[in-house]
């Protein structure tokens, strides 16, 4: 037996079988850095139509988690796909750098501002800390393969950004949207500050639920209201509350004019309840022998005076539209400084707005009996006092949804304080925002209804904060009238100029006289701006001012929690400052959870860190998992899920390697064969690739990365791996090196690789770079500067062997493979080349298959394939799952060719080559080698 190894075209490529991504990726990153690849992209696509995806700023605090990674990877995939489509698609990363979380970190090391450390030094430390955190996160984002202008990111603490926030505020004031108000706002006692809606989250809390007796002062008036002559016992209005700590601030009781109220006698006193709540309330009190004396309407009760349960204070009964008879007692305790409805009622009736609770959550010195006590701890003492004074009708516990601080996870309180607001009603901001939402594209589509509901119901936006590390609210108000200085806009622009030069410190360290002359009449506001105003201003501070970008953004892409956060604040700032929408399209992705659908938590031990993933499996595995997951809902990740992703990656890599290894020696300048002259199967491969490319580009355009990933995987494993590449192995390895059959296959492979590497590039950025380096090409451009491949062709409309034809051939081949597997299991054959395949076909299928002539065997990867009419079928033939088709498999008895391994009666016909078939002899000895037309 001779050794024919040197006569075969064995596969050869520099593209390795093993990814070894964790080690290779940093080297590829280093190469990109040296090439200045992002700068080259910008230069190459300069002047093209722009596509701007505006980056929502992550908070500069701590290492990135897998949610951050998902967000940046999705953005990177979209940007890279848009670049492939020929857009100038810049990506400028941003960071949120002010606010409480950074203050808390600095406090741990240096103590509170103004106590252990000066406020000026505290801000310097905050700036230093934020800068360090940005560098940590930047390194991680770059390691994920995310391309962007990392050297010039936008930080909300950049001096120019801080200054432009002040200029944005000036526009908002100029447009009439700012208002000052003494209003109840969500207040965190740990933050010592008001919170915006976006900083409030709801969680279950167990609270005391008590029914309190307010004694009616004028019994005769009450009797008259119920149509009675008189009352011979004390009467009480009963309120139900879950916030006993607000009782010191009670100033009124609210009823509804339209509701019916009952007077009920219990032993030696009367109580007042809403008629529809009598039965369930008495049941709650476990009282059975009560007697309903009379019923009246709420409007008859208004004006009657009650007495505070433990203070010498008169409490009027007033009408409130917010009062219902759905729960409680139908009479509502009213503390104007601790609730929105209470406040509205208090303003309407000029009730006392005395503040009883300080910013730290303790009662102020003017709170009799409870001064200095923490409000939530004082509830038990208040309940005890009510019992002593016989004013407690009932006491219970209730588990209910309650507002908590998003940062501290502690319960909030409503607290009326002087604050600055962007008004939702002045200048019709709410209606304008709602109209703009309708004009914006939202995906998933439910995002529109979600943000509409939030904007429709949201209160005025409280933009003032009582913090140290934040952009100032640099206003001057009159010391007596509290009106804004008449030159406010001019002053703000002066402040912005100083901040642009020296940062926010320029305001905090300045004297008032540097900005105004009337310091005797006006004082400066010491508040800072809500950090959501920082990020919400980004469209004004970045998109509207940076000529490299454009306003509005084409796309915002963030987690689904941003309907109440950045999407909303961006909209409100842009609408109030510029009067137009900041974005054309808004996409959201779901949260990352574990394989059981649980949130990531250190306590559960289910945290998957991006650092662990890219240091072990590689960033491309994380990128592939991100792209493969339908990100419109929750995204499950675990070690097991990532292992499956790594398996998928291996299949994709092996396909790329097989393709590249069969391009050894191929010169695209001299060896390309025209489409019409290719072997028919190679024509199919190119046309099929074109069909997939059209679908893939469409999916990329719709940001459907999971569809892209599915299509690429299907293409590699089914169309290529299970069909085309399986069939052409024989031709590639055994045909004459420079003969037409092999060059035809190499031409198809060349086109396929050039398309496939581009499909992969947005997702598998590192691997695509590696593939590109190993690919024969006619350009020196790096893959990042390429556009979608245009060398693919489709079949003409009148093509006889078109995609539909080959789809039917694939079906038939699958059925043949099924029967081959049956015969393998029966030990009739060990491999398909040992099989003699006979297909019995009806007229329709016969016509399909006869077109392939004697090359049918190459498609079926067998040594012999016969086609016969169905009437000649034998009892040993097996019915296919295709109508009009039977298949018979027998073992071929011909000798094996030692070169191509086909069984052939021609083995030994040539005395010089006794152990190979005549086809192999032709490929070794003749100038042209064998010819192929179909496969």
UniProtKB/Swiss-Prot annotation:
Enzyme Commission number(s): 6.1.1.5
Domain of life per record: Bacteria
Residues noted as binding ATP in the record, renumbered to the chain: 602
Keywords: Aminoacyl-tRNA synthetase, ATP-binding, Cytoplasm, Ligase, Metal-binding, Nucleotide-binding, Protein biosynthesis, Zinc
Binding annotation for L-isoleucyl-5'-AMP: 558
Cofactor(s) essential for the protein: Zn(2+)
Record localization: Cytoplasm
Predominant place of localization: cytoplasm
Annotated residues for binding of Zn(2+): 897, 900, 917, 920
UniProt motif 'KMSKS' region: location: 599-603
Motif stretch ('HIGH' region): 58-68
Similarity field: Belongs to the class-I aminoacyl-tRNA synthetase family. IleS type 1 subfamily.
PANTHER family noted in UniProt: ISOLEUCINE--TRNA LIGASE, MITOCHONDRIAL, SOLEUCYL-TRNA SYNTHETASE
Domain notes for this protein: IleRS has two distinct active sites: one for aminoacylation and one for editing. The misactivated valine is translocated from the active site to the editing site, which sterically excludes the correctly activated isoleucine. The single editing site contains two valyl binding pockets, one specific for each substrate (Val-AMP or Val-tRNA(Ile)).
Subunit structure of this chain's protein: Monomer.
Protein's name according to its UniProt entry: Isoleucine--tRNA ligase
Phylogenetic placement of the source organism: Bacteria, Pseudomonadati, Pseudomonadota, Gammaproteobacteria, Thiotrichales
Protein encoded by which gene: ileS
């Amino acid at each position: 037996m001779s050794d024919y190894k040197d006569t075969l075209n064995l596969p050869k490529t520099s593209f390795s079988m093993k990814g070894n991504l964790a080690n290779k990726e940093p080297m590829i990153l280093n190469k990109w850095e040296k090439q200045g690849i992002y700068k080259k992209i910008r230069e190459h696509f300069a002047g093209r139509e722009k596509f701007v995806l505006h980056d929502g700023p992550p908070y500069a605090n701590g290492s990135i988690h897998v949610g951050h990674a998902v967000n940046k990877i999705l953005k990177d995939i979209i940007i890279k796909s848009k670049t492939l489509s020929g857009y100038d698609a810049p990506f400028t990363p941003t960071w949120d750098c002010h606010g409480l979380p950074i203050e808390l970190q600095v406090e741990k090391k240096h103590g509170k501002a103004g106590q252990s450390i000066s406020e000026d030094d505290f801000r310097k430390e905050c700036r230093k800390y934020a800068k360090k955190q940005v560098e940590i996160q930047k390194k991680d984002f770059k390691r994920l393969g995310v391309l962007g202008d990392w050297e010039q990111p936008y930080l909300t603490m950049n001096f120019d950004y801080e200054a432009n926030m002040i200029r944005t505020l000036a526009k908002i004031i100029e447009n009439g949207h700012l208002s000052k108000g003494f209003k109840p706002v969500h207040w965190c006692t740990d933050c010592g500050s008001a919170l915006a809606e976006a900083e409030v989250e709801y969680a279950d809390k167990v609270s005391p639920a008590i029914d309190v007796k307010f004694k009616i002062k004028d019994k005769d008036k009450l009797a008259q209201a119920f149509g009675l002559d008189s009352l011979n016992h004390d009467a009480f209005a009963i309120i139900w509350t879950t916030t006993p700590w607000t009782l010191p601030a009670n100033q009124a009781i609210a009823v509804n004019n339209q509701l019916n109220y009952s007077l009920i006698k219990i032993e030696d006193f009367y109580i007042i309840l809403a008629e529809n709540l009598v039965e369930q309330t008495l049941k709650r009190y476990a009282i059975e022998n009560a007697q309903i004396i009379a019923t009246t309407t709420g409007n008859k009760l208004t004006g009657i005076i009650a007495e505070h349960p433990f203070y010498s204070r008169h409490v009027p009964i007033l009408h409130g539209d917010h009062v219902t008879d759905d729960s409680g007692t139908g009479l509502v305790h009213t503390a104007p400084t601790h609730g929105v409805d209470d406040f509205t009622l208090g303003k309407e009736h000029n009730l006392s707005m005395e503040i009883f609770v300080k910013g730290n959550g303790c009662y102020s010195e003017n709170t009799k009996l409870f001064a200095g006590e923490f409000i939530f701890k004082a509830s038990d003492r208040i309940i005890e006092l009510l019992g002593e004074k016989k004013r407690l009708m009932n006491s219970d516990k209730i588990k209910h949804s309650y507002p908590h601080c998003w940062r501290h996870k502690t319960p909030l309180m409503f607290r009326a304080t002087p604050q600055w607001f962007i008004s939702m009603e002045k200048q019709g901001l709410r209606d304008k925002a709602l109209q703009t939402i309708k004009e914006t594209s939202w995906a998933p589509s439910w995002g529109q209804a979600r943000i509409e509901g939030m904007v429709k119901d949201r209160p005025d936006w409280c933009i003032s904060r009582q913090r140290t590390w934040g952009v100032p609210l640099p206003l001057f108000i009159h010391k007596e009238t509290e009106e804004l200085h008449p030159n406010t806009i001019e002053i703000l622009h002066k402040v912005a100029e100083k901040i642009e030069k020296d940062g926010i410190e320029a305001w905090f360290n300045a004297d008032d006289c540097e900005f105004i002359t009337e310091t005797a009449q006006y004082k400066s506001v010491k508040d800072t701006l809500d950090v959501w105003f920082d990020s919400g201003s980004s469209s004004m501070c970045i998109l509207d001012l940076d000529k490299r970008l454009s306003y509005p953004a084409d796309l915002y892409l963030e987690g689904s929690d941003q309907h109440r956060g950045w999407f909303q604040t961006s909209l409100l700032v842009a609408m109030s400052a510029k009067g137009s929408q900041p974005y054309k399209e808004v996409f959201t992705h779901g949260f990352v959870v574990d394989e059981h659908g649980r949130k990531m938590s250190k306590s559960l031990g289910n945290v998957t860190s991006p650092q662990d993933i890219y240091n072990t499996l590689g960033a491309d595995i994380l990128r592939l998992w991100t792209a493969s997951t339908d990100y419109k809902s929750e995204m499950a990740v675990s070690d097991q899920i990532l292992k499956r992703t790594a398996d998928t990656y291996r299949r994709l890599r092996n396909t790329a390697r097989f393709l590249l290894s069969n391009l050894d020696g191929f010169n695209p300048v001299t060896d390309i064969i025209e489409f019409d002259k290719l072997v028919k199967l190679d024509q199919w491969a190119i046309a099929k690739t074109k069909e997939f490319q059209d679908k893939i580009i469409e999916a990329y355009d719709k940001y459907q990365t999971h569809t892209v990933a599915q299509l690429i995987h299907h293409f590699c494993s089914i169309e290529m791996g299970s069909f085309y590449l399986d069939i052409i192995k024989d031709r590639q390895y055994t045909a004459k090196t420079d003969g037409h059959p092999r060059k035809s296959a190499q031409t198809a492979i060349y086109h396929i690789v050039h398309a496939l590497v581009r499909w992969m590039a947005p997702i598998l950025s590192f691997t695509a770079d590696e593939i590109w380096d190993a690919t024969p090409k006619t350009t020196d451009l790096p893959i990042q500067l390429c556009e979608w491949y245009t060398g693919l062709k489709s079949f003409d409309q009148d093509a006889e062997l078109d995609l539909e034809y080959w789809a039917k051939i694939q079906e038939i081949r699958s059925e043949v493979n099924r029967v081959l597997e049956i015969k393998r299991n029966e030990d009739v054959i060990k491999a398909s080349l040992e099989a003699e395949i006979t297909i019995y076909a009806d007229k329709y299928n016969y016509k399909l298959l006869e077109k392939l002539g004697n090359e049918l065997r190459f498609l079926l990867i067998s040594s012999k394939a016969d086609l016969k009419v169905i009437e000649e079928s034998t009892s040993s033939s097996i019915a296919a799952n295709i109508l009009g088709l039977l298949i018979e498999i027998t073992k071929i008895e011909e000798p094996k060719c030692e070169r191509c391994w086909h069984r052939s009666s021609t083995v030994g016909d040539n005395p010089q080559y006794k152990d190979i078939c005549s086809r192999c002899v032709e490929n070794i000895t003749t100038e042209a080698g064998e010819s192929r037309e179909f496969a």
